[in-house]
Amino acid sequence: MTFEKLGEPALDYFPCRYGTSKLLFRGPRRRLEGDFVTFLGGIETYGRFLPTPFPALVEHETGMRSVNLGCVNAGVDAYLNDRSLLDICGRSRATVIQLTGAHNMSNRFYAVHPRRNDRFLRASRYLTRLYDDVDFTEFNFTRHMLTSLAARSAEKFDQVRQELKSAWVARMRALIENIDGKVVLLWLADHKPCEDGEDCVADKDPLFVDRGMIQALTDATASVIEVAASPAEIAAGRDDMVYGAMDLPAAEEMLGPVVHRRVADQLARTLDRLM
């Protein structure tokens, strides 16, 4: 385990931008010429605390240049609303999309920041009528707000959850359909997707996403890869992560390099077959 001065980052992620996008990605910046594969997703795709996250490992295994467009706070909206990034995906040989939660996107009940999708902006009149006793100005983040609403009323919250699930499927399908070329979906978590009729793990990412929602997208994708990391795999990779002392709680939430190597192996085989 590598520690640096208290509060200082232990890795230089060489932040960079692509095209006209305002989002910051992990660098160094890659050339967008010739054959390459694009990767969309959240903090695991970005590879926080990892010297070599799975997009880079895929490049090593396949010889195909990887363009890592993973973003720490991005949900579906950040990509769907960014024409520049969609154009980059359309120029690639394939696009891998790590599935992100259904909570970090705008919907009938609330709006999120267009780039930092974890940021709650405002409640709609539907939500304020449903929860007429809640002061929504108290919330800055979607997860905090949803946790509070769920604690107040399970019956009311079921309406919110169903809206998020429905909106996620529609938004994901729109994202896939706006990408020219092959799309591979990646489930990456410390648990399997819950089956229809089961209660999804309430506080685990990707939040509210179940197997039925993923299956609703399979007709529009080239492949779906499922990686459910075991506690042993996560623990085995902990010593190879790089972070400062202040980042320990956040680092403990990450899946780690052993899991990323398994993801890369599966993706490399799939991409070789598709291309």
Cite the ranges covered by each PLM segment.
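Membrane-targeting and insertion segments and their boundary/processing signals
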Residues: 10-11, 25-28, 32, 36, ...
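Helix-enriched interaction subdomains in cytosolic or periplasmic regions
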Residues: 1-13
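Alpha-helical structural elements
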Residues: 8-9, 20, 126, 238
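A broad, low-specificity signal for short, low-complexity segments enriched in glycine/proline
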Residues: 1-4, 55-60, 142-149
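Short, hydrophobic/glycine-enriched beta-strand segments
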Residues: 1, 37-41, 98
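Serine-esterase "nucleophile elbow" of acetyl-processing enzymes
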Residues: 14-73, 78-88
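Alpha-helical cap/lid subdomain in secreted, periplasmic
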Residues: 87-275
